[in-house]
């Protein structure tokens, strides 16, 4: 099958067992909206999560140090989040979704983010010191749980 892709130009062979995308594949990739595809795949999972927990569920992507919310499924709980909306951006360093995305960065990319950041407190509880943010992100990596404890808004825990 790989030989057919090489023959068609979709895959380039650079050496023994070394392959990369050919021009047609690269052009096709440029036309693909990865975030939209991810949202389409993730929506059923988020619906189930919101249904089972009663809480609002989100899917976001990291764009230039900000979280862009691509999917928002409202929960049925009385205090389900009403703050967010699809297409909205929030600072990654203080939002639950943003912290999850930051925890998924490589160590080098996380350090770059912390080095270039101008972290502004949105509430008195917002973590803004790079050392505190680093520790928080490392804890998220360890536990798999990210919490925004009134860091974006005084009346919102995420």
Report each predicted region and the residues it spans.
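Basic amphipathic alpha-helical segments that dock to polyanions
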Residues: 1-8, 140
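Generic alpha-helical structural context detector
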Residues: 3, 99-103, 138
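Beta-hairpin "wing" of winged helix-turn-helix
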Residues: 5-16, 20
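Amphipathic alpha-helical effector-binding/dimerization core
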Residues: 20-116
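Extended hydrophobic
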Residues: 125-158
